[in-house]
């Protein structure tokens, strides 16, 4: 297996909270898989960063955010409805001001 792509993203917690305050559950339903939707806002922000990092690593902008499911604990990403070669490894973290994630796509 070789590294085929790397993506990284950072999300401002305050900006994420503002988007949620404006759009509420509609925002959550559009960007998160059903099993993710009940998570705390800080965890959702971290998963949003992870989904963005996965899109960057795979270089496939057509994948919907909702179809990128971050494993729990966040180690591997799955793409619902789309088969990808290899695996996408994910590491995420969040603290008071920011959430950050990196994704590494590994394939033959």
From Swiss-Prot:
GO terms for biological process, alphabetical: fatty acid biosynthetic process
Cofactor: Mg(2+)
UniProt keyword list: Cytoplasm, Fatty acid biosynthesis, Fatty acid metabolism, Lipid biosynthesis, Lipid metabolism, Magnesium, Metal-binding, Transferase
Residue numbers binding Mg(2+): 9, 52
Subcellular location: Cytoplasm
Cross-referenced Pfam families: ACPS (PF01648)
Gene3D superfamilies for the chain: 4'-phosphopantetheinyl transferase domain
Tagged with keyword Metal-binding: yes
Record bears the keyword Kinase: no
GO cellular component, one term: cytoplasm
Catalytic activity annotation: apo-[ACP] + CoA = holo-[ACP] + adenosine 3',5'-bisphosphate + H(+)
The EC number(s) this enzyme carries: 2.7.8.7
GO molecular function, one term: holo-[acyl-carrier-protein] synthase activity
Functional note: Transfers the 4'-phosphopantetheine moiety from coenzyme A to a Ser of acyl-carrier-protein.
Family: Belongs to the P-Pant transferase superfamily. AcpS family.
The protein's name: Holo-[acyl-carrier-protein] synthase
Biological source species: Coprothermobacter proteolyticus (strain ATCC 35245 / DSM 5265 / OCM 4 / BT)
Upper lineage: Bacteria, Pseudomonadati, Coprothermobacterota, Coprothermobacteria, Coprothermobacterales
């Amino acid at each position: 297996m070789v590294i085929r792509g790397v993506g990284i993203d950072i999300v401002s917690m305050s900006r994420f909270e503002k988007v949620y305050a404006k759009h509420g559950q509609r925002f959550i339903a559009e960007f998160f898989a059903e099993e993710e939707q009940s998570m705390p806002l800080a965890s959702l922000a971290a998963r949003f960063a992870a989904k963005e990092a996965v899109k960057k690593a795979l270089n496939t902008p057509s994948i919907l955010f909702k179809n990128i499911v971050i494993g729990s604990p966040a180690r591997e990403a799955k793409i619902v409805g789309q088969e990808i070669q290899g695996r996408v490894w994910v590491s995420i973290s969040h603290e008071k001001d920011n959430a950050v994630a990196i994704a590494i796509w590994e394939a033959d």
